[in-house]
Amino acid sequence: MLDVKILRTQFEEVKEKLMQRGGDLTNIDRFEQLDKDRRRLIAEVEELKSKRNDVSQQIAVLKREKKDAEPLIAQMREVGDRIKRMDEQIRQLEAELDDLLLSIPNVPHESVPIGQSEEDNVEVRRWGEPRSFSFEPKPHWEIADRLGLLDFERAAKVAGSRFVFYKGLGARLERALINFMLDIHLDEFGYEEVLPPYLVNRASMIGTGQLPKFAEDAFHLDSEDYFLIPTAEVPVTNLHRDEILAADDLPIYYAAYSACFRAEAGSAGRDTRGLIRQHQFNKVELVKFVKPEDSYDELEKLTRQAETILQRLGLPYRVVALCTGDLGFSAAKTYDIEVWLPSYGTYREISSCSNFEAFQARRANIRFRRDPKAKPEYVHTLNGSGLAIGRTVAAILENYQQEDGSVIVPEALRPYMGNRDVIR
């Protein structure tokens, strides 16, 4: 959520920056108009209250002098009724303004490239060289089917499309990757492990920016008003909702494995085969709470930490800075890490690392004090995938496939796979 004071005092500057994102700006224009209406009503109410106080003194004088005060008393009753009606109008306007604030996206950081779509994203760096195959590389779902690692057909029978059963060494590979990633983030980068709930309440979804804008992409349990988490970012960020942290506690780093659940409402016909776009998938999420002045250094560190996983696995990738038109709703700046998938002949997103500045913290009311007597300030929050497990499985199967249909296990992963060096 944007700072209301900045939105009011620097409206045109904020609007200009939001225009760089593209899309509909109706809500921010409506916010300006309703806020003007609210301030006008408040001024009128204050004027009426001042008038009422003056007339009350006149009524007191008339009563002391035993003169007729009824006309003024009747007038003040009418003024009192007007004040009540206007106070109710103000309350309604404030409720609508609060709703509008929740629907206005974050302002892009000045370093974000200006553009309209993913075509305008800017490549920052690459690591590794895509492998040259002496045979036609197969897509991961064909490799997995031949090796008995994944079963999409039976998952469709049990649950529906965009679900999968991991079986045998496929299940072990998934579990190995979870442990491998967590061990690196915990032991080398100092994250604290969190195992979060998979169901959250509405306030949590609002806190991280999933609601109200992305309601159609969430799985909702109507009977209890719970939501299945689309990412561990939601419960882990809300871990400190409505709290004031001590400056000495910052930065806070959390790493969380969880299943993630997404309706993929806008993805009909896209990535219908394989692991790239599932309703349920596993992910290791990295979440940071930091001081505002440190957040952009922390974003660079976060991105490098996610990259480390791909480097250890020997998977070629690139890092791109998202342009303003491709930036997520809550993010001020985002780097996408894209892994090379031979069957696609291109790089596909495997991690998204974002700095939200105070946007989420303001929605979730997460603050800190620089010293015990200082006024609380909003923290900056960051998060990134470290990594998406299913897409990592897909990348390993495709990049390490052999002509005989077997798959080499990346060396760093072998201790987690019972020292197995090949899947056949």
Curated annotation (Swiss-Prot):
Task: Give its localization.
Answer: Cytoplasm
Q: Which GO terms describe its cellular component?
A: cytoplasm
The record's section on InterPro entries has: aa-tRNA-synt_IIb (IPR002314), aa-tRNA-synth_II (IPR006195), aa-tRNA-synth_II/BPL/LPL (IPR045864), Ser-tRNA-ligase_type_1 (IPR002317), Ser-tRNA-synth_1_N (IPR015866), SerRS_1_N_sf (IPR042103), SerRS_core (IPR033729), tRNA-bd_arm (IPR010978)
- The residues the record assigns to binding L-serine are 231-233, 285, 385
Decide whether keyword ATP-binding is in the record.
yes
Catalysed reaction(s) here are: tRNA(Ser) + L-serine + ATP = L-seryl-tRNA(Ser) + AMP + diphosphate + H(+); tRNA(Sec) + L-serine + ATP = L-seryl-tRNA(Sec) + AMP + diphosphate + H(+)
Q: Does the keyword Ribosomal protein apply?
A: no
Any one GO biological process: selenocysteine biosynthetic process
Tree of life domain = Bacteria
Return the EC number: 6.1.1.11
Q: In which pathway does it act?
A: Aminoacyl-tRNA biosynthesis; selenocysteinyl-tRNA(Sec) biosynthesis; L-seryl-tRNA(Sec) from L-serine and tRNA(Sec): step 1/1
Q: Which UniProt keywords apply?
A: Aminoacyl-tRNA synthetase, ATP-binding, Cytoplasm, Ligase, Nucleotide-binding, Protein biosynthesis
Chief subcellular site? cytoplasm
Q: How does it associate, per the subunit comment?
A: Homodimer. The tRNA molecule binds across the dimer.
| Function noted in UniProt | Catalyzes the attachment of serine to tRNA(Ser). Is also able to aminoacylate tRNA(Sec) with serine, to form the misacylated tRNA L-seryl-tRNA(Sec), which will be further converted into selenocysteinyl-tRNA(Sec).
Domains (record comment): Consists of two distinct domains, a catalytic core and a N-terminal extension that is involved in tRNA binding.
Protein's recorded name:
Serine--tRNA ligase
Q: Which organism is it from?
A: Geobacillus kaustophilus (strain HTA426)
Q: What taxonomic ancestry is recorded?
A: Bacteria, Bacillati, Bacillota, Bacilli, Bacillales
